[in-house]
């Protein structure tokens, strides 16, 4: 199954862009950081702008992230660019735990494509360079 999707690179001229969103990050008080629901369009708006080359991104160990000021906050009185920056922060310890969990998950597969383990190893290395 994994290999089928990896092989698409050779079969499709214009591959789709892939984005990952965690709508459920919590702050130090256990509350959701992102307002959610109807405000999700703000992130989707950034994704469309990114795909159209209208906005840039910041490189991180987990991929490219929006500049906080590129997320439209019009009409959100209780949500600031600083809140967006907090939401976009990459917690090294959390991600190292995530990588360890993924490594354990990968052990369940007997025919896992090498490309997946290579990508995970590369991400692990990017985090190691930050320490």
Regions found by a protein language model. Name each.
Residues 1-131:
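Flexible, glycine-rich loop/tail regions that form catalytic "lids" or insertion modules at the edges
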């Amino acid at each position: 199954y994994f290999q089928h999707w990896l092989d698409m690179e050779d079969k499709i001229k214009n591959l789709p862009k892939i984005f990952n969103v965690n709508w459920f990050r919590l702050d130090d008080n256990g509350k959701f950081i992102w307002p959610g629901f109807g405000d999700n369009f703000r992130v989707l708006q950034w994704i469309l702008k990114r795909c159209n080359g209208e906005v840039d991104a910041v490189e991180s160990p987990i991929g490219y992230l929006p500049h906080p000021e590129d997320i439209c906050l019009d009409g959100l009185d209780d949500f600031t660019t600083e809140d967006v920056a907090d939401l976009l922060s990459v917690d090294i310890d959390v991600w190292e735990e995530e990588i360890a969990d993924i490594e354990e998950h990968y052990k369940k597969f007997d025919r896992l494509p090498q490309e997946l383990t290579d990508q995970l190893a590369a991400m692990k290395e990017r985090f190691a360079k930050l320490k």
